[in-house]
A protein has these predicted regions:
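Specific transmembrane helices
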Residues: 2-3, 18-161, 189, 256-291
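Membrane-interface interhelical connector segments
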Residues: 167, 171-174, 202-213
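Hydrophobic/aromatic residues in alpha-helical transmembrane segments
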Residues: 121, 172, 228-232
Length: 291
């Protein structure tokens, strides 16, 4: 309560109340959300991919194509379940969600170019260092094998970027960021992403199966999930999930067109992406966002 004092003329003067500062909002605990998301993402993906493995793989049995493709949508299914659950409960959007706005479209396009450039630069440098030569014939064959440019681009967009990014970046990332720093979240999601991909090494007909898990190329693929997670996270922080989808699409598409399989090329790309994300993360600061 305010206190009263007297002036020299005896007139009471009310002293101002002490200033108060608003307490910071409580840090929400998203462990239940994250557990539910991870269980759904892994269960949907691994059950589908397990079925593809049991059917003999996509190389020898066309029936394996459906579960193989459906497996990629585990993270998206998890994201949709959490979104519906949050709305039904009337819960607020997590503080670290980055909403996409039309004004950010140019930034997303620039990040798409950057993502592709990290792969192209790595392949060119590896070629100069004695690695495999780049060939347009490989790219032409990759596009032709799936029925032309339109089918190729749609397939590359859906099977990976669209099926994964709303989950890993749009759902898991903001909730992990509530208690962890950006770099810590990148490491957590990078390792999680690498583990999530492991069944693909056992599906005949996949890129991962061709690489082989117990080979330098397979090991480098697994390790590359960490700088890749950092790269798409840096894109997400700047322009939302549309940007992370764009970067994921650009990297995957460029790697397929260039047939990146040699360890020397993979290592060079991994190094360039690591340097790129270091620069991106160091030059970007994020506060707590509220919708």
């Amino acid at each position: 309560m305010p206190t009263s004092q007297s002036t020299s003329h005896g007139t009471p003067v009310t002293a101002p109340a002490p200033a108060t500062t608003a307490a910071p909002g409580p840090v929400r605990d998203y462990r239940a959300d994250l557990t539910l998301f991870m269980v759904i993402a892994f269960a949907v993906s691994w059950l589908c991919w397990g079925a593809a493995i049991a059917l003999g793989g996509t190389e020898t049995n066309e029936a394996a194509n459906a579960p193989y493709l459906l497996g990629a949508f585990g993270p998206l299914v998890g994201a949709l379940v959490l979104r519906i659950r949050r709305r039904r409960r009337g819960e607020p959007v997590p503080a670290h969600v980055v909403r996409f706005r039309p004004a950010l479209l140019l930034k997303a396009l620039l990040l798409l170019v950057l993502g592709s450039a990290t792969v192209l630069a790595g392949a060119l440098l590896a070629s100069r260092a004695g690695g495999p030569e780049l060939s347009l014939d490989v790219a032409k064959d990759a596009v032709k094998d799936v029925g032309g440019p339109a089918a190729f681009l749609v397939g590359m967009l859906v099977s990976g970027p669209l099926s994964e990014e709303p989950g890993w970046r749009g759902t898991a990332y903001p909730r992990l960021r509530e208690k962890l720093g950006t770099l810590q979240v990148c490491l957590v999601l990078g390792v999680t992403w690498a583990v999530w991909h492991l069944p693909l090494f056992f599906i005949d007909g996949t890129v991962q199966h061709d690489l082989g898990l117990a080979t330098p190329s397979g090991v480098l693929f697994v390790v590359s999930n960490i700088p890749m997670a950092m790269l798409v996270t840096a894109a997400y922080e700047r322009a939302g999930v549309v940007a992370s989808i764009a970067v994921h699409f650009a990297v995957n598409t460029t790697m397929i067109l260039l047939a990146v399989e040699e360890p020397k090329v993979q290592a060079m790309i991994l190094g360039i992406q690591s340097l790129t994300v270091t620069a991106l993360l160091l030059t970007h600061r994020t506060g707590r966002r509220r919708p």
